């Protein structure tokens, strides 16, 4: 893609300016310009709405679980397979997504991804059998693949290293807010227009948002920044911005011990997150005999806890770094503590005797796992060279979603064979704890630019 010379209203967030406009401040002093503030605000608002729509899409099948099973005659294992095939397609698509994102940037990648995942979401409302559903779920998984790597890339591009904690928490919280508002919103939509109308409506909204993203957002390399703006954005960064990775450099990441620690560790986080995302409404309906309306309200509560965990993480990591703790160490502490606590709460869930007790325990498990997960993405910002962030993020996501793809189908199979979620929750807690151990023993050194090795 050629570099754009943007000539728009000077009040716009993305108006270019000559590097000679403002001198670089002396003595290392950096300032955030009004234009950079507007760019950051615009980018974060667009990412927020994209993340909410993204998780409305992901939650739709979970909320409509029992209704779709009855209409299409599907078993719990088949529903689990539909949930798993999405995750598997999403994970595999992460591999080409990273290098493409490093080359094409978030504007094109997220715009196209959002358009196609929303198109397949709308098509989900038109299926009539299991095979058709599998195909549209695969399409959705591929389309959604750029979402998180694009978010990481946008934040890495438009915030300097000391100010990325809160925007990362905000971005991640948006996804959980999407999950939290999904059950009551989707349940209400189903009561009014049925599950088919729900899928189609959400898909159309996503298509409009995709068009808005492409029209409003600009990649950093396509904006002519002043010297002061460059100084602000690069402040504290050890690694300079360079050319995208070659295939050989990308392949070399799989020989890096820290990369494997991130892959295995984040797999523990995504297994837990995806199990609850896929099966929480079904669990509440099956274990506690809740109706659709009550399920919609109760299922929202744990995900609000998860959103809170993401937001709290941003403040905690920024506070630790400003207090003198090394950025990598601050993220690792949050990751490991959050994962062990989440595992403990998940293991206690089967002991709950009331739906409210179960919801609160799951809420604490999600608070802790999303607290940890936010630092996993934050770790990429501080432990990885800038030109490699998208590739590392996509590889991490690839591994974690391959692992997470087993959670729905394993859970569905266990429910079909034991008529209980107990064993599925125990397995989940153990996987989470194993992920924490991967961060302890494998993630010890930053991932440096191979050109400097």
UniProtKB/Swiss-Prot annotation:
CDD domains recorded: MFS_ExuT_GudP_like
Membrane topology classification: Multi-pass membrane protein
Annotated stretches, region: Disordered: 1-23
Periplasmic side: 1-42, 93-107, 196, 281-295, 354-359, 416-422
Cellular compartments annotated: Cell inner membrane
Catalytic activity reported: L-galactonate(in) + H(+)(in) = L-galactonate(out) + H(+)(out)
Phenotype of null mutants: Cells lacking this gene fail to grow on L-galactonate as sole carbon source.
Polar residues: bias regions: 10-20
Expression induction or repression: Highly up-regulated during growth on L-galactonate.
Cell inner membrane listed as a keyword: yes
Molecular-function GO terms, alphabetical: transmembrane transporter activity
Entries under InterPro entries matching the protein: MFS, MFS_dom, MFS_Na/Anion_cotransporter, MFS_trans_sf, Sugar_P_transporter
Residue ranges annotated as Cytoplasmic topological domain: 64-71, 129-174, 218-259, 317-332, 381-394, 444-453
Transmembrane segments: 43-63, 72-92, 108-128, 175-195, 197-217, 260-280, 296-316, 333-353, 360-380, 395-415, 423-443
Sequence similarity: Belongs to the major facilitator superfamily. Phthalate permease family.
Name recorded for this polypeptide: Probable L-galactonate transporter
């Amino acid at each position: 893609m050629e570099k754009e010379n943007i000539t728009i209203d000077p009040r716009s967030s993305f108006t270019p300016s000559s590097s000679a406009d403002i001198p670089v401040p002396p003595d290392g002093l950096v300032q955030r310009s009004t234009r950079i503030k507007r760019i950051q605000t615009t980018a974060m608002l667009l990412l927020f709405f994209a993340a909410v729509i993204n998780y409305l899409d992901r939650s739709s099948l979970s909320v409509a679980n029992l209704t779709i099973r009855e209409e299409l005659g599907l078993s719990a294992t088949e529903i689990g397979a539909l949930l798993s095939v999405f995750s598997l397609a999403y994970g595999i698509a992460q591999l080409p997504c990273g290098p493409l994102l490093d080359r094409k940037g978030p504007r094109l990648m997220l715009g196209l991804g959002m358009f196609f995942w929303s198109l397949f979401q709308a098509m989900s409302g038109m299926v009539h059998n299991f095979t058709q559903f599998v195909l549209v779920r695969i399409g959705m998984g591929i389309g959604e693949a750029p979402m998180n790597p694009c978010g990481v890339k946008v934040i890495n591009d438009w915030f300097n290293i000391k100010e990325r904690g809160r925007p990362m928490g905000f971005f991640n919280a948006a996804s959980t807010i999407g999950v939290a508002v999904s059950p009551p919103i989707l349940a209400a939509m189903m009561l009014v227009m049925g599950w088919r109308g729900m899928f189609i409506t959400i898909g159309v909204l996503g298509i409009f948002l995709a068009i808005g993203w492409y029209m409003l957002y600009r990649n950093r390399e396509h904006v002519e920044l002043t010297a002061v703006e460059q100084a602000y954005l690069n402040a504290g960064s050890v690694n300079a911005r360079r050319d995208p990775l070659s295939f050989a450099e990308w392949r070399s990441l799989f020989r890096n011990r820290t990369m494997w620690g991130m892959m295995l560790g984040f797999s523990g986080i995504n297994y837990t997150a995806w199990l609850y995302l896929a099966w929480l409404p079904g669990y509440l309906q099956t274990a506690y005999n809740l109706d659709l309306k009550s399920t919609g309200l109760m299922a929202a509560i744990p995900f609000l806890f998860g959103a809170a965990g993401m937001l709290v993480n941003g403040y905690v990591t920024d506070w630790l770094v400003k207090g003198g703790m090394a950025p990598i160490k601050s993220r690792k502490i949050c990751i490991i503590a959050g994962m062990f606590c989440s595992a403990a709460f998940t293991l206690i869930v089967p002991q709950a005797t009331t739906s409210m007790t179960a919801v609160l325990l799951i809420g604490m498990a999600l608070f802790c796992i999303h607290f940890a997960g936010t630092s996993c993405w934050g770790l990429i910002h501080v432990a990885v060279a800038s030109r490699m962030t998208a590739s590392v993020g996509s590889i991490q996501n690839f591994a974690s979603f391959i692992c997470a793809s087993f959670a729905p189908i394993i859970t569905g199979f266990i429910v079909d064979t034991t008529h209980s979620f107990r064993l599925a929750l125990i397995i989940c807690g153990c996987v989470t704890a194993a992920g924490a151990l991967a961060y302890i023993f494998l993630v010890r050194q930053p991932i440096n630019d191979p050109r400097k090795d």
